[in-house]
Amino acid sequence: MGITISPWMMAFLILMTGFAGFVDSAAGGGGLISLPAYLFAGLPPHYTYATNKFSAACGTTFATANFFKSGAINVKVGVLAAIGSFAGSALGAHIVLLLSDELLRTMMFLILPVAAVVILWQRDLPDQNRDDGTLNLKKTLLALGIGFGIGLYDGVVGPGTGTFAIIAFTTLMGFDLRTANGNGKVLNLASNYASLFTYLMNGLVVFHIGIPCAVSNILGNLLGSHFALKKGARFIRPMMLVVLVLLLGKLISDAVL
């Protein structure tokens, strides 16, 4: 399909996908910015999702490498979560057509307030790692479960995946925000590639638009991950709240409009 956009719209997309990469690497939720941007630029929905996954996967790859080099990833847990996430995202891509928009919207209205309460009222969201470093059967199953559940969410819904991964890793695995964010990147990377593979096989990625946006997204991810690693909880927590507010606002606007 021959899709063309104006130079001004291309510049707009490059700017927005760069900002999306910054937000996503810091707290997750970059898709909330980039998906509407692609749609606004005139890409059909299927091409929007595919091209967004392409640029997001490229950016997340570099952010994940940044977190890994800084020692902010529990590799064993990250690999297990990635396996679960890949499977969950692949399954989500197949079942999404079975769910109505109303059901998905209702699910999100139930999930977001809970997430907001956890962040707002759990004052001791850890800035120190409470994990003892061991990996037993319980933690193995928990890591696989977190990966599968959030990967499934990413395949079915999408925006906010990284934010929910941070919440899951801090509250369930005992990670500090920095390590939770790093492992969330590994999880999100696997989920992105699971979806991207499907889109590539169907020829839905618009490369002449996606490649410049991918470069911008990479730069945004590198900058955002730098701030997240340097500032830690002081930077990540406010960004998480901003993303949750944006998510809730999008749901309300979708319901009203």
Give short role names for the model-derived ranges:
Residues 1-44, 130-181:
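Selected transmembrane alpha-helices and immediately adjacent juxtamembrane segments
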Residues 14, 18, 22, 53, ...:
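Residue-level signature of the transmembrane alpha-helical core
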Residues 147-157, 195-203, 210, 247-257:
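Hydrophobic alpha-helical transmembrane segments in multi-pass integral membrane proteins
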